[in-house]
Amino acid sequence: MATLQSLADLNRANTQTSNPENEAPVHVQKLDAQGRAYATGKRKDAVARVWIKPGNGTVVVNGRAVETYFARPVLRMILRQPLEIVGRVDQYDITVTVKGGGLSGQAGAVRHGLSKALTYYEPELRSPLKREGFLTRDPRVVERKKYGRKKARRSFQFSKR
């Protein structure tokens, strides 16, 4: 490395090595050895690990079919949302391991993980999924119970006399 004699030399060296800030980051395909894209999704206390690969639309959640694990149609609709937005319904086989939380939180975690896995498999899908908000982790969690109160915010009944 050349020695720097002045502040101008330092500025010149910094501008040559750093990337311009206006360039968009390049997203590349991330696949494992079996050709699957892997991502984790989170929602409330639930954590979902999602693997996708090209296939005919089979969805397996914790070793069970999605219809038996998520019996309520609303939960299955939440899972399908990312695929419907990008028009890739029945084009990927999806394997999911999910734990923690309740069924609603688990469905949200699977949706988050599936959206991330889709962007790892097809980086050009990032902008429509980000526009719909599927790549953003929902930060809302249950507020803790405080001492001196009945619940997180509810106080004990107050008696004036």
Curated annotation (Swiss-Prot):
One of its GO terms (cellular component) is cytosolic small ribosomal subunit. One of its GO terms (molecular function) is structural constituent of ribosome. Keywords: Ribonucleoprotein, Ribosomal protein. Residues 1-21 have a biased composition (Polar residues). GO terms for biological process: translation. SUPFAM superfamilies: Ribosomal protein S5 domain 2-like. PROSITE patterns: RIBOSOMAL_S9 (PS00360). Residues 1-25 are annotated as: Disordered. This is Small ribosomal subunit protein uS9. It comes from Methylorubrum populi (strain ATCC BAA-705 / NCIMB 13946 / BJ001).
